Swiss-Prot record:
One biological process term in Gene Ontology: nuclear-transcribed mRNA poly(A) tail shortening
Outcome when changing residue 119 to E: In IDDSADF; uncertain significance
Effect on the protein upon substituting residue 697 to Q: In IDDSADF; uncertain significance
Function noted in UniProt: Component of the CCR4-NOT complex which is one of the major cellular mRNA deadenylases and is linked to various cellular processes including bulk mRNA degradation, miRNA-mediated repression, translational repression during translational initiation and general transcription regulation. Additional complex functions may be a consequence of its influence on mRNA expression. May be involved in metabolic regulation; may be involved in recruitment of the CCR4-NOT complex to deadenylation target mRNAs involved in energy metabolism.
Gene3D superfamilies per UniProt: CCR4-NOT complex subunit 2/3/5, C-terminal domain
Basic and acidic residues bias spans: 284-293
Listed Gly residues bias regions: 396-408, 479-491
Expressed in which tissues: Ubiquitous. Highly expressed in brain, heart, thymus, spleen, kidney, liver, small intestine, lung and peripheral blood leukocytes.
Name this protein carries in UniProt: CCR4-NOT transcription complex subunit 3
UniProt biased composition (Polar residues): 294-315, 424-433
Region (Repressor domain) location: 661-753
GO cellular component: CCR4-NOT complex; CCR4-NOT core complex; cytosol; nucleus; P-body
Biased amino acid composition, Pro residues: 317-330, 458-467
Length: 753
């Protein structure tokens, strides 16, 4: 009798739980259908799942009681079981809706009407992918076993069984990789619709047999497995796009790790099928082609030579450097130019251009570069004695002499080799004061030993030919190791055509030495005066001499960067011959010359406009340094403008409206509104005080108010855990949170007085 009463009590408790669970399920189900967004729906769906699991456990218990013979009246149990099953059906509907909500009805309809051929193709493709993954996993297992065995055989040499096992594993790895390559090729052909699904199905059994039984001792492989698929006729583009599944580098790692002499054969796997030969050969050819291309592209750098750009000197033939055997022809200009000079040159007028002669040998002690030389037509000779012409003012660097170094110079200049190179720039100014019209080369050199000399033809002192009063002369910026063209050649490097003034007959011809000219150029552009004599420049300082010697002995292979000049950069003014003996000086404009390597500038370098602007902006920014508070959000200031109200309205707030008792009579939502939207006011303080009196607690991490829904399940010194109700100020509503851990360090527990 007592057992029956006990059983009836259990049944009553179970049925009570069922009714409560069904009510809870109904409540959550209503919330789910009224949910506004997807996150809430997911949350309610999870709650539904929990409730339905509880009901399912109760249903199992009820089914047990229904099956037993101890209970006579089973109607109530059966009704409750059906009620639970009804809720289960409702949950299945909800679950189906949530799973298919991302797809439209049309999409679901199309999904049911899949093309059978497409479905078959997808199944075969999935089988190929799974088989490739299985083979790759087996390859990884083999490789790890080979590695461990290699370590053991290294410690114990002469273990023949382990070496045989290693060799067998390597053969398995080679065959597996061969099959992986073939299957990947078939998979790509299937994606490209270049192979039939039935053809793949024919080899499916053999491939599965290989995957399952390839390690059996009595396994016999079908060597003609892929012959029917005609993989030898694969387009090359299809093979080229194949991603490398495994590189041969792993084999080389095995070779290095294994000490057996026969392990070297694994670096190039030989598949049993001839279909692989095509793939292997094509891959080897591609590798060889890539290496050949890279070797060809790197060959100039390997040989240590620099490629010569053909568009820089299209007509300048290369001449080996030799010493001249005799004096150069009259009115010819021999000067040095860098090999990479790319400055455009204005062409000389036809009257000043003479026939091009073959390149004369020129002395060059620097690096060889293409040579270009121009020979101008000789001027008509006069009946009187020949007057020596002043050479173009040219410093010469390196231990060389002038162009007449073989004893053939007829001018009065003395060329000084070694210490007269221009050091503060890549190009020097050179100019000439002439007393009779002829072609004169204004040349410059950047530190090599090829000085230039212009020899004028013999002419009378008082009868200069008027037709040649203004002849173009060439000013070519030069560097180390090249020859610049003269005025009569427009095929070489750039040249500037400069009109020269004519000296009156009464002015004596000044003669310069190369050392004096170099000294003048180190101190700046040469200044020509109307005096008949020119003062000798000051001797070179020790700093300049040291810089000069350093530049000469540095042995720079690359030519000094050339100065890019245009007709607007250098303005040379000339005047016609005045009747008086005075001659106006030659005017030169300033140009910025880049420094050559190893040369110190003579004075501070002036800043450009852009650099000055940047400096001014930096200085201005220094006075307004950013502060960390600049990153904070700016709080807008809203002034309180009192609005004039009629006198019959209340002019003062109602009494006792600023007390805690007044705020306690307000609703909870009003208190939350005051707390969140009247920040920094007394009203916020009073609202917080009223909320605390209603047992709400403020969480300083989430900035939300929490209230216990029930007694916490766990209470420690650091936290308490249980079910809480919190006010979500973003969605403006109260939410329930189960199993929430409220850490006391985030509890705002100041006593509000």
């Amino acid at each position: 009798m007592a057992d029956k009463r006990k059983l009836q009590g259990e049944i009553d408790r179970c049925l009570k739980k069922v009714s409560e669970g069904v009510e809870q399920f109904e409540d959550i189900w209503q919330k789910l259908h009224n949910a506004a967004n997807a996150n809430q729906k997911e949350k309610y769906e999870a709650d539904l799942k929990k409730e339905i699991k509880k009901l399912q456990r109760l249903r199992d218990q009820i089914k047990t009681w229904v099956a037993s013979n101890e209970i006579k009246d089973k109607r109530q149990l059966i009704d409750n079981r059906k009620l639970i099953e009804t809720q289960m059906e409702r949950f299945k509907v909800v679950e189906r809706e949530t799973k298919t909500k991302a797809y439209s009805k049309e999409g679901l309809g199309l999904a049911q009407k899949v093309d059978p051929a497409q479905k078959e193709k997808e199944e075969v493709g999935q089988w190929l992918t799974n088989t490739i993954d299985t083979l790759n996993m087996q390859v990884d297992q083999f490789e790890s076993e080979v590695e461990s065995l290699s370590v053991q055989t290294r410690k114990k040499k002469g273990d023949k069984d382990k070496q045989d096992r290693i060799e067998g594993l390597k053969r398995h790895i080679e065959k597996h990789r061969y099959h992986v390559r073939m299957l990947e090729t078939i998979l790509r052909m299937l994606d490209n619709d270049s192979i039939l699904v039935d053809a793949i199905r024919k080899i499916k059994d053999d491939v599965e047999y290989y995957v399952d039984s390839s390690q059996d001792p009595d396994f016999e492989e079908n060597e003609f497995l892929y012959d029917d698929l005609d993989l030898e006729d694969i387009p090359q583009a299809l093979v080229a796009t194949s991603p490398p599944s495994h590189s041969h580098m792993e084999d080389e790692i095995f070779n290095q790790s294994s000490s057996t002499p026969t392990s070297t054969t694994s670096s190039s796997p030989i598949p049993p099928s001839p279909a692989n030969c095509t793939t292997e050969n094509s891959e080897d050819d591609k590798k060889r082609g890539r290496s050949t291309d890279s070797e060809v592209s790197q060959s100039p750098a390997k040989n240590g030579s620099k490629p010569v750009h053909s568009n820089q000197h299209p007509q300048s033939p290369a001449v080996p450097p030799t010493y001249p055997s005799g004096p150069p022809p009259a009115a010819s200009a021999l000067s040095t130019t860098p090999g990479n000079n790319g400055v455009p040159a204005p062409a000389a007028p036809p009257s000043a251009l003479g026939p091009k002669a073959s390149p004369a040998p020129s002395h060059n002690s620097g690096t060889p570069a293409p040579y270009a030389q121009a020979v101008a037509p000789p001027a008509p000779s006069g009946p009187s004695t020949t007057q020596p012409r002043p050479p173009s003012v040219q410093p010469s660097g390196g231990g060389g002499g002038g162009s007449g170094g073989g004893g053939s110079s007829s001018s009065s200049n003395s060329s000084a080799g070694g210490g007269a190179g221009k050091q503060n720039g890549a190009t020097s100014y050179s100019s000439v004061v002439a007393d009779s019209p002829a072609e004169v080369a204004l040349s410059s050199s950047g530190g090599n030993n090829a000085s230039s000399q212009a020899l004028g033809p013999p002419s009378g002192p008082h009868n200069p030919p008027p037709s040649t009063s203004k002849e173009p002369s060439a000013a070519a910026p030069t560097g180390a190791g090249g020859v610049a063209p003269g005025s009569g050649n427009n095929s070489g490097g750039p040249s500037l055509l400069v009109p020269l003034p004519v000296n009156p007959p009464s002015s004596p011809t000044p003669s310069f030495s190369d050392a004096k000219a170099a000294g003048a150029l180190l101190n700046g552009p040469p200044q020509f005066s109307t005096a008949p004599e020119i003062k000798a420049p000051e001797p070179l300082s020790s700093l300049k001499s040291m810089a000069e010697r350093a530049a000469i002995s540095s042995g720079i292979e690359d030519p000094v960067p050339t100065l890019h000049l245009t007709e607007r950069d250098i303005i040379l003014s000339s005047t016609s011959a005045p009747p008086a003996s005075a001659q106006p000086p030659l005017q030169l404009s300033e140009v910025n010359i880049p420094l050559s390597l190893g040369v110190c500038p003579l004075g501070p370098v002036p800043l450009t406009k852009e650099q000055l602007y940047q400096q001014a902006m930096e200085e201005a920014a220094w006075h307004h340094m950013p502060h960390p508070s600049d990153s904070e959000r700016i709080r807008q200031y809203l002034p309180r403008n009192p609005c004039p109200t009629p006198p019959y309205h209340h002019q003062m707030p109602p009494p006792h409206s600023d007390t805690v008792e007044f705020y306690q009579r307000l609703s909870t939502e009003t208190l939350f509104f005051i707390f969140y939207y009247l920040e920094g006011t007394k009203a916020q303080y009073l609202a917080a005080k009223a909320l605390k009196k209603q047992s709400w607690r403020f969480h300083t991490k989430y900035m939300m108010w929490f209230q216990r829904h029930e007694e916490p399940k766990t209470i420690t010194d650091e936290f308490e855990q249980g079910t809480y109700i919190y006010f979500d100020y973003e969605k403006w509503g109260q939410r329930k949170k189960e199993g929430f851990t409220f850490e006391y360090r985030y509890l705002e527990d100041r006593d509000l007085q």
